[in-house]
């Protein structure tokens, strides 16, 4: 038997993405965004409203970075979602994390998060189905601690996912299958 539930953003897992920009004074701003995905291999889509300080910064600078949050920094990642850059100018400084300038875009890389996508702002879309930032990924970097044989080993990243049903975070660490291979067992 199935139970009927209220409608919510019910896709799981939802990524916990750290979207980083520079403010007007060159200080770092970061927000926590769960509504994000890849549109193509090199295009990021983030469902963010224009009231966010981060969106204002993206439009002004033409760039942003997207990092994948990890379990070791759950407190900081959550803080970036509960505190507004419009209200707290030194939000990033209060986190205790550090940043460096991205190699290819005018945006910061949060050093403590293991994977970072450097993005060039393409456009802001606003229509009946939602609104958001579209960016072109121009560089991807990863901390050496998560690299095995020249590739990212997601079991070492300890990425976290947002649970929209109970508003919790879960660690995403165990590989359970081989994409585009396991299903071939049923193909006739």
Q: For the regions a protein language model found, what residue spans apply to each?
A:
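Basic, polyanion-binding surface patches
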Residues: 1-188
């Amino acid at each position: 038997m199935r139970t009927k539930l209220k409608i919510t953003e019910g896709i799981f897992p939802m990524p916990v993405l750290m979207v980083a920009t520079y403010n007007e004074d060159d200080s770092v701003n970061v927000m926590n965004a769960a509504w994000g995905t890849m549109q193509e291999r090199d295009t990021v889509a983030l469902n963010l409203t224009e009231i966010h300080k981060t969106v204002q910064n993206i439009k002004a600078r033409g760039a942003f970075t997207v990092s994948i949050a990890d379990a070791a920094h759950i407190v900081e990642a959550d803080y970036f979602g509960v505190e507004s850059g419009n209200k707290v100018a030194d939000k990033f400084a209060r986190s205790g994390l550090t940043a460096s300038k991205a190699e290819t875009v005018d945006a910061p890389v949060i050093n403590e998060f293991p994977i970072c996508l450097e993005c060039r702002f393409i456009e802001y879309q606003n229509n009946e189905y939602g609104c958001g930032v579209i960016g072109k990924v121009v560089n991807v970097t990863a901390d050496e601690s998560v690299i095995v044989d020249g590739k990212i080993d997601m079991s070492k990243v300890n990425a976290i996912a947002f649970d929209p049903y109970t508003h919790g975070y879960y660690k995403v660490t165990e590989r359970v299958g081989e994409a585009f291979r396991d299903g071939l067992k049923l193909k006739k």
